UniProtKB/Swiss-Prot annotation:
Active site residues of this protein: D935 (proton acceptor)
Name recorded for this polypeptide: Eukaryotic translation initiation factor 2-alpha kinase 3
UniProt-listed CDD domains: Luminal_EIF2AK3, STKc_EIF2AK3_PERK
Molecular function GO terms recorded: ATP binding; eukaryotic initiation factor eIF2 binding; eukaryotic translation initiation factor 2alpha kinase activity; identical protein binding; misfolded protein binding; protein kinase activity; protein serine kinase activity; protein serine/threonine kinase activity
Alphabetical UniProt keywords: ADP-ribosylation, ATP-binding, Endoplasmic reticulum, Glycoprotein, Kinase, Membrane, Nucleotide-binding, Phosphoprotein, Serine/threonine-protein kinase, Signal, Stress response, Transferase, Translation regulation, Transmembrane, Transmembrane helix, Tyrosine-protein kinase, Unfolded protein response
Glycosylation sites recorded in the entry for this protein: N254
Gene Ontology terms describing biological process: bone mineralization; calcium-mediated signaling; cellular response to amino acid starvation; cellular response to cold; cellular response to glucose starvation; chondrocyte development; eiF2alpha phosphorylation in response to endoplasmic reticulum stress; endocrine pancreas development
Tissue expression per record: Ubiquitous. Highly expressed in mouse pancreas, an organ active in protein secretion (at protein level).
Protein species of origin: Mus musculus (Mouse)
Biased composition (Polar residues): 790-803, 1091-1108
Length: 1114
């Protein structure tokens, strides 16, 4: 019996295994229960609220990790309840009453706490094990065609329409999906749900105390939990949407978004009170005591401002005074939510508020409406970002509250009579970075960013918004309200307001936000200053006057004349009116540059606004007298009749009568180019003086010359003594009332502007070109206005001649102190008398019958204004300008061409004959039309771009049978012949012109002879040129010329015959044998063009040349 009942070894072993099994079964109950949670949720429909990745995350809740980084925190983990039982009471030290924590929720599902009073040091970090807040299978925008669904973290959906570039709320919420499925399209049905999980945490240590869900609650260390410990309640809301096919039930896409909400339970409050909605803040004495403790410790955070930067994942603290950065902490993932826990209160930090909030929750009566309006104006924003390749939205509370919750209210959402309009967000994204230019992003660029983001997955998890790279780095802000926000900063401010009077100042501007824009503000201020200065100087200050050259001197006038001129100038300026006048020249043409002056006017290069071709526009000031005006109009009539390839082409002409002083002001603008250093206003061509030589010998050192103005009422006169001794070059530029020249025996390069009064001003003087008073045909330095200190103002001994100018065309020529636009007063006509024209000379009187190689020069210059009277000043008459549109040629003329080729080797014989032949053909055409040029010289011969020779400057062209009755009226040069003005270039004038005899078209033949000789025989110096050409005029040719060119010598000798009848016709010159033996390209073609184009003038007139402008001869 004993033996039977005695347990054997096998029974003992079996009993031992049973005891061990029971012990193991008890310890496995909790894990087994936790493993049932996901299965139960799935069975009861809660699993539908979790994404495919979230179904496996629920078991991880039981093993949450807590990382305590504070030095005072406990080292134990939340998942190890055993270690917490042996912990000392250090929690009491870790949670002083005045301590403040910043709780941060990130998109990866972690919760972190920062100590706001300890330089933002991380207090603890908790991974609750529930996974990321955002997960989705939506990867490409092509899923919905031109529309795209973007989820928001709070569970709402937005639909982005690419066509309309707008973001609007999808007409359903997750709550409505719990009641019934909603059909999104013809082939898609949307279903969804949400799950709630609540976590209880120790406020200051981060220890996980319990977890509650729909399946129940699990607690840790409930026996050792301190009753006085503050508890943080984290409630995670996870919402899931799935799209399935209505027929097959297959899933097309899904997404899951979630967010945390934070509650604070101070001290003895039961944890079930929050879940059962029985928690009443401030309902016990302990809360009152805590509030009193807060008031005592608030001084430690008096000047602290907490900011959360969503785009940079930073939490920062600034001092309110001065905006100094006290501390900052940057997370590795985007921030989803933020709260400030301070002494029994949880202050949510808004992610869409760019100004400050207080911690006070008290109502302010009348100010409540103002505060709400201010909040609505700034909080209505949406932040668009990307996490692990999925777009998501963070919307403000204001936008979420506007979403309709009833599907019935949205039945006519697509119609015009919608019951509740959907909230719409205009697609005007704002870049988060305030230091970069805030540009707007179009839908095309946004699509491009989406397509480039296909690799934005796990490798971009640390760069959460990888879609939005520079310049759109880290995200967009979309304003919900119509008026766009003025500020671009995404940093949100929370202030600690400690004084009672701060409670009424609900929102205050951030004191440091403008510091990000200091560069833009400084640049804007600087730009405004520069623009204002420029506008003021242009509108209210006159243009600076051209500085006087060294060769220019101040006019010497009497004080009486100065005062009268100044008064007239001021009155004219005050009476000037510009309104209502439109210039045809400025309307049809775009001025390019002023090419030069000569031939009665000024020549501009201008571009036609219609055909985009450049033309030469010649402007001539017409005189008021009818007969004198007819002389100027003769050039227009002559040009209009001339249709020949060797003559500068005429296109159009018109008259303009601008208001007083308008033209002078425009000249100051047009003639700023230093390359055209002409005076800014020109004299009237017909108001120029007439010259009367009282001796038949025009080059005698004792001649007396009177220059008499055609207008009898002008009585003001002045006397001028002209001194010599100055030297100039061929490129000397004439300034007002100044003429460049040389001494009596010096070299000069300008032989065509000796006494050129034509353009002492651009608008008012006549071209008295090369009407020199001595034998040297070069330019001479005539300074009509020297200073008193000049030694040349003294009278010198020697021969003298008297020149009397009754009008020079520039009434106030001596008043150079006035602005250039005010120099001319046509109504102030004065009689000007030039006297004491002295120049020493060693020439004998026997040389008076011929052109002297070294003629006499004047030596002194003086002004004598003795007859000025105020009563003689009369109002000026309106100025009339004639504009002539001509062909544009190269600026280089034949004179320049020869000056650059000063040796026989540089001048090919065939080229020279080719140039001369083209000139002769043009002259022959003129003669065939019954016209003569009378002023042929190298400076009047131009070239086109294809080297075709053009004869220009027809200011002296006149008919061969012109009526000679003009002599009795104009009497320009009574000692000369009877044609217009008799002001041709003297060096190339025929003997009959110089001696004042009647002449015919043979004067052009004489000039052609000299031009042919000068082409074939180059000169090394201008002095040599004057001397040899003077001898050639007397048929004294150089030996080298006669030996090298015998045929040309005979031809030139015939052309320079003293008798006009013995000179050949232009036709005979063209048919000369010297041209037949030469072969050069273009001769035959040129002559054919001459015949064909002259017969079809209308057709040719429509083919303007777009090259360079002609320089009228000087």
């Amino acid at each position: 019996m004993e033996r039977a009942t005695r347990p054997g070894p096998r029974a003992l072993l079996l009993l031992l295994f049973l005891l061990l099994g029971c012990a193991a079964g008890i310890s496995a109950v909790a894990p087994a229960r936790s493993l049932l949670a996901p299965a139960s949720e799935t069975v009861f429909g809660l699993g539908a609220a979790a994404a495919p990745t979230s179904a496996a995350r629920v078991p991880a809740v039981a093993t949450a990790e807590v990382t305590v980084e504070d030095a005072e925190a406990l080292p134990a983990a939340a998942g190890e309840p055993e270690s917490r039982a042996t912990e000392p009471d250090d929690d009491v030290e870790l949670r002083p009453r005045g301590r403040s924590l910043v709780i941060i929720s990130t998109l990866d599902g972690r919760i972190a706490a920062l100590d706001a009073e300890n330089d933002g040091k991380k207090q603890w970090d908790l991974d609750v094990g529930s996974g990321s807040l955002v997960s989705s299978s939506l990867s490409k925008p092509e899923v919905f065609g031109n529309k795209m669904i973007i989820p928001s973290l709070d569970g709402d959906l937005f639909q982005w329409d690419r066509d309309r570039e707008s973001m609007e709320a999808v007409p359903f919420t997750v709550e409505s999906l719990l009641e019934s499925s909603y059909k999104f399209g013809d082939d898609v049905v949307l279903v969804g749900g949400k799950s709630l999980i609540t976590y209880g945490l120790s406020a200051y240590s981060g220890k996980l105390r319990y977890i509650c869900s729909a399946l129940g609650c699990r607690r840790w260390d409930s026996d050792e939990m301190e009753e006085e410990e503050d508890i943080l309640l984290l409630q995670r809301t996870q919402k899931t949407v799935r799209a399935v096919g209505p027929r097959s039930g297959s899933e097309k896409w899904n997404f899951s978004v979630g967010h945390f909400e934070l509650r604070y339970i101070p001290d003895m409050e039961t944890r079930a009170g929050f879940i059962e909605s029985t928690f009443k803040p401030g309902g016990n004495k302990e809360d009152s005591k805590i509030i009193s403790d807060v008031e005592e410790q608030e001084a430690t955070m008096l000047d602290t401002v907490i900011k959360v930067s969503v785009a940079d994942w930073k939490v920062m603290a600034f001092s309110r005074k001065g905006g100094r950065l006290e501390w900052e902490y940057q997370f590795c993932t985007p921030i989803a939510s933020a709260w400030l826990v301070r002494d029994g209160k949880v202050i949510p930090i808004s992610l869409f508020d760019d100004t400050s909030y207080t911690a006070s929750e008290e109502a302010l009566g009348d100010e409540e409406d103002i505060v709400e309006a201010a909040r609505g104006a700034t909080e209505n924003s949406v932040y668009l970002g990307m996490y692990r390749g999925q777009l998501y939205l963070q919307s403000s509370v204001r936008v979420s509250e506007k979403f309709p919750t009833s599907p019935k209210a949205l039945e006519s959402v697509n119609g015009e009579n919608a019951i509740i309009p959907l909230p719409t967000i205009k697609w005007k994204p704002l870049i988060h970075s305030p230091s970069r230019t805030p540009v707007l992003v179009g839908s095309d660029e946004f699509d491009k960013c989406l397509s480039n983001d296909k690799y934005s997955h796990e490798e971009y998890s640390n760069g959460a918004l990888s879609i939005l790279q520079y310049p759109y780095d880290n995200g967009y802000y979309l304003p919900y309200y119509k008026r766009e926000r003025n500020k671009r900063s995404t940093q949100i401010t929370v202030r600690f307001l400690d004084s009672p009077h701060y409670s009424k100042n609900i929102r205050k501007k951030d004191p440091i936000l403008l510091l990000h824009w200091w560069k833009e503000i400084f640049g804007t201020i600087l730009l405004c200053i520069v623009a204002t200065t420029f506008i003021v100087r242009r509108l209210f200050h006159p243009q600076p006057h051209r500085q006087r050259k060294e060769s220019e001197t101040q006019c010497q006038t009497e004080s009486k004349y100065d005062s009268v001129s100044a008064d007239v100038s001021d009155n004219s300026w005050n009476d000037m009116k510009y309104s209502g006048y439109v210039s045809r020249y400025l309307t049809d043409f775009e001025p390019i540059q002023c090419m030069g002056r000569g031939g009665f006017g000024v020549v501009f290069e201008a571009k036609n606004k219609v055909d985009d071709c450049n033309y030469a526009i010649k402007r001539i000031r017409l005189p008021n007298r009818e007969l004198a005006r007819e002389k100027v109009m003769r050039e227009v009539k002559a040009l209009a009749k001339l249709e020949h390839p060797g003559i500068v082409r005429y296109f159009n002409a018109w008259l303009e009568t601008p208001p007083e002083k308008w033209q002078e002001e425009m000249d100051e603008i047009w003639l700023k180019d230093e390359s055209t250093d002409w005076p800014l206003s020109s004299p009237s061509p017909m108001d120029a003086p007439s010259v009367k030589i009282r001796r038949m010998d025009p080059f005698s050192t004792k001649e007396q010359i009177e220059v008499i103005a055609p207008s009898p009422e002008r009585s003001r006169s002045f006397s001028v003594g002209i001194s010599c001794g100055q030297t100039s070059s061929s490129e000397s530029q004439f300034s007002p009332l100044e003429f460049s020249g040389t001494d009596c025996g010096d070299n000069s390069d300008s032989a065509d502007a000796a006494y050129n009064l034509q353009d002492s001003c651009l608008t008012d003087c006549e071209d008295v070109e090369d009407g020199t008073v001595d034998g040297n045909d070069e330019g001479h330095s005539f300074e009509l206005c020297p200073s008193e200190a000049s030694p040349y103002t003294r009278s010198r001994e020697g021969t003298s001649s008297s020149i009397v100018f009754e009008d020079s065309g520039c009434g106030n020529a001596s008043s150079k102190e006035e602005p250039r636009g005010n120099r001319l007063h046509d109504g102030n006509h004065y009689v000007n008398k030039l006297t004491d024209l002295k120049c020493s000379s060693s020439r004998s009187s026997s040389e008076a019958t011929t052109l002297s190689t070294s003629p006499t020069r004047p030596t002194t210059l003086s002004l004598d204004f003795t007859k000025n009277t105020v009563g003689q000043l009369q109002p000026s008459s309106p100025k009339v300008y004639l504009y002539i549109q001509m062909q544009l040629c190269r600026k280089e003329n034949l004179k320049d061409w020869m000056n650059r080729r000063c040796s026989l080797e540089d001048r090919e014989h065939g080229v020279c004959l080719h140039i001369f032949l083209q000139i002769a053909e043009a002259v022959e055409f003129l003669h065939s039309k019954g016209l003569m040029h009378r002023d042929l010289k190298p400076s009047n011969i131009f070239f086109t771009m294809d080297d075709v020779v053009k004869v220009g400057d027809f200011g002296l062209v006149t008919a061969m049978d012109q009526d000679e009755e003009e002599q009795t009226v104009l009497t320009p040069m009574p000692a000369y012949a009877t044609h217009t003005g008799q002001v041709g270039t003297k060096l190339y004038m025929s003997p009959e012109q110089i001696h004042g005899n009647n002449y015919s078209h043979k004067v052009d033949i004489f000039s052609l002879g000299l031009i042919l000789f000068e082409l074939l025989y180059p000169f090394s110096t201008q002095m040599e040129r004057v001397r040899i050409l003077t001898d050639v005029r007397n048929l004294k040719f150089p030996l080298l010329f006669t030996q090298k060119y015998p045929q040309e010598h005979m031809m030139v000798q015939d052309m320079l015959s003293p008798s006009p009848t013995e000179r050949p016709e232009a036709t005979d010159i063209i048919e000369n044998a010297i041209f037949e033996n030469l072969e050069f390209p273009g001769k035959t073609v040129l002559r054919q063009r001459s015949r064909s184009m002259s017969s079809s003038g209308t057709k040719h007139s429509r083919q303007p040349s777009c090259s360079y402008s002609p320089l009228p001869g000087n």
